[in-house]
């Protein structure tokens, strides 16, 4: 339906803007279904999220993955986070383009002094504020959106330090109109992104890889169950096809095997966001799963 990226310095009123926009959309004539994806939904500590680059990269990966799953639900998805890096906003724009939906950026333009003051007030109230060092680092690295960039356009700018942001705010109403306006052949002021061949191919490739991973891991589970069902105690499961054997020192029940399989598939999906891609053939997927099981069984048997 649509993807809205909330952008701004730390403690610049982004969450207020996100909630206000969501409520206004829900109360609009079209009664839109809205979902806010924010950092709090992952139950992670704010300062831990930005303590170092790996932690920050992990947070962005979680947000991006959640957005990717949500844009096809028919809801308007609002991403309430710093979204301070232009390369990351470009990635979110690519998700919207691949889904063929509307996209916009809402920028909370607040000067550093006000953000710093609001962060201090939040900490003084015992709320979740940023540590001084982390706050200054985030301010320094912030990349302001520019409407000339396709991934920052259309750009709706709010000024929370100068005006109260509520459902009657002109910019909020303008954004609601953009997100809900009926599009026909005569509409010129609303743009629905069109997926390119490259983005469609990437989604097909990812879906194919997930299918291969799911099928290959299930075959390994079936082989373990089958060889254990022969009756005699075994310490090794042989798989053939030039795959290494699986070393086991105790009977492994089907519930445990299923749990390990689910964990492995989840880990593979998360690591593909920032590390090596998912395997595209069955043998590679099986080999990775066998290596994972040997590590798990080795640790459990020690």
Curated annotation (Swiss-Prot):
GO cellular component: cytoplasm; elongator holoenzyme complex; nucleus
Keywords: ATP-binding, Cytoplasm, Nucleotide-binding, Nucleus, Transcription, Transcription regulation, tRNA processing
Phenotype reported upon loss of the gene: Defective organ formation due to disorganized shoot, inflorescence, flower, and root meristems leading to stunted roots, few root hairs, lanceolate leaves, and a highly enlarged, disorganized shoot apex that does not produce an inflorescence. Altered cell division and cell differentiation in leaves. No detectable 5-carbamoylmethyluridine (ncm5U) modified nucleosides.
Binding site for ATP: 8-15
Location in the cell: Cytoplasm; Nucleus
Family, as annotated: Belongs to the KTI12 family.
Protein name, as recorded: Protein KTI12 homolog
